[in-house]
Amino acid sequence: MYVLVCPGIHDPQATQDFLQGLQRVMDEAAFTWLIFPTDRYPAYSAIHISWFLCTQLRSVHLQDWLNQTVAIISFSAGVVGGIATAWSWRLMGGTIAALIAVDGWGVPLVGDFPVHRLSHDYFTHWSSALLGAGQDSFYAEPAVDHLSLWRSPETTQGWWFSPSSPSSPQLITAAEFIATLLSRYNARAVIEDES
């Protein structure tokens, strides 16, 4: 499964820190990672992100590039481009395993694919849910600043909320939450590929 990472408007080192934080809790080699270059294109530009995704997949899969399953992890302004790219990919006939929106406050998140929100504090968590709660979600407790959630997911503690058991949230790190979701959707993609 491909994982498209759509960073926000920040120093690219923060995205490298994010990926290193994920590496500490998951087998990164189980996925093919595509990091959208926000140093060359606007983080919020779905046109540029979609072009990047298509170009990357066509370079590897000449004939069946549209048959590749993609999960999208987006942060801040990248959530704007990420959700629009997910819809673009779906309209072209592609499969979106999930959209994981990290601190996409104020961005409506609705799709015919799983959507998950991570928030740096409780206020952002509940106020963002008004624009599409999605499925399982996470918020940092204690609260952290906006960029720290992206830069240090492995040390950001918080609560995992599941719609299937809303009365029993689980204490977890942001990195563990993301790793669990990616593992879940990767397993589904493998099963679908085999059938």
Question: Where does each model-flagged region fall?
Answer:
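Active-site nucleophile loop of the alpha/beta-hydrolase fold
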Residues: 100-109, 120-123
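Active-site catalytic motif of lipid deacylating hydrolases and related acyltransferases
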Residues: 1-68, 114-195
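Residue in the alpha/beta-hydrolase core beta-strand immediately N-terminal to the catalytic nucleophile
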Residues: 71, 98-100
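A short acidic (Asp/Glu
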Residues: 14-17, 81-87, 110-113
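Conserved hydrolase catalytic core segment
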Residues: 84-97
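Gly/Ala-rich beta-loop-alpha elbow adjacent to hydrolase catalytic centers
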Residues: 72-82
